Amino acid sequence: MADTNERTPLLKVEHLSKEFPAESGMFAKRFSKRVVSAVNDISFEIYPGETFGLVGESGCGKSTTGRTIMRLTKPTAGKVFFQGKDVAEMSKHEIKDMRREMQFIFQDPYASLNPRMTIGEIVSEPMTIHGVGTKEERIERVRELLDVVGLNPEHINRYPHEFSGGQRQRVGIARAFALKPKLIICDEPVSALDVSIQAQVLNLLKELQDKFGTAYLFIAHDLSVVQHISDRVAVMYLGKMVEISDWKTLYSEPHHPYTQSLLSAVPVPDPDIQKTRKRIILAGDPPSPLDPPTGCRFHTRCPIAQGICSEKLPEFKEVAPGHCCACHFAEPFPIKESHIDL
């Protein structure tokens, strides 16, 4: 686990927002004013060697956050600083250099690998693009990486269809580590895998982090997965960041009603403890990002909402050292034994 005290952040995100046009087509994009607010004014930092978990329901904007940081899509507003440099002010050459230090692990191990390329070609592709080493050196590096992620280096000339889902994701992990990056954005890297395989991949990511000192932005919707690997965790709802803290505090004493409801739904493998836990049921479905609620975006489903919640946006403020929450009535809610070993 990384110590974030008195350290310079590797990645700093300030008031990041991303909107998409609601309609497609040339004229709609030019004349329509309707937009989907995917990410709205979020800020956080990631320090060298730490894992920062980003969790939320589907459609909350967590994957868009990762893609915007990587500059795969341009932000509507806000700034992203990587190693102290403003990404928006980087030239194309500097962007390419940044991507050498910042890599991506995709969610789908089937769609993220080119079926026409061998495993060796897939893993060596980042090195080829960035002109790293000779062909022989790249092949040797690929063999080393395959061995590190638990695959047989002799399978270097095989194709993706010859591997299982878990093995394919290991290939994706090997590719992400090929350039020895300082930060890897993991976009739900285990959600498409069987539960039995998820733990293996998570443990592999932790081992590689210990070995290479790489930082992770770990995006997921499964709270137990995020808890298993993260140093700090942020919770998103409908494009907004509602709570952020170290994982122990967040999972034991969440302050935001949305975080509390998510954690109350995490099952505990002890029937005696499970019987005593209070389940928080949310009413209705998340509102459309096309027309988000006024004030606090969570107030339409919040069990403790009052008049001010629909009128005024809550400040994202510190409720304890290192623990921030966006709620007018933030209070700790003790969670009994929410930890789950994968």
Features from the language model and the residues they span:
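Conserved ABC ATPase "signature" region
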Residues: 86, 137-154, 260-264
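Conserved ABC transporter NBD signature motif
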Residues: 78-86
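A short, proline-enriched helix->beta-strand linker immediately N-terminal to the Walker B motif
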Residues: 178-182
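Conserved ABC ATPase signature
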Residues: 159-163, 167
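Helix-to-loop junction immediately C-terminal to a conserved catalytic motif
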Residues: 70
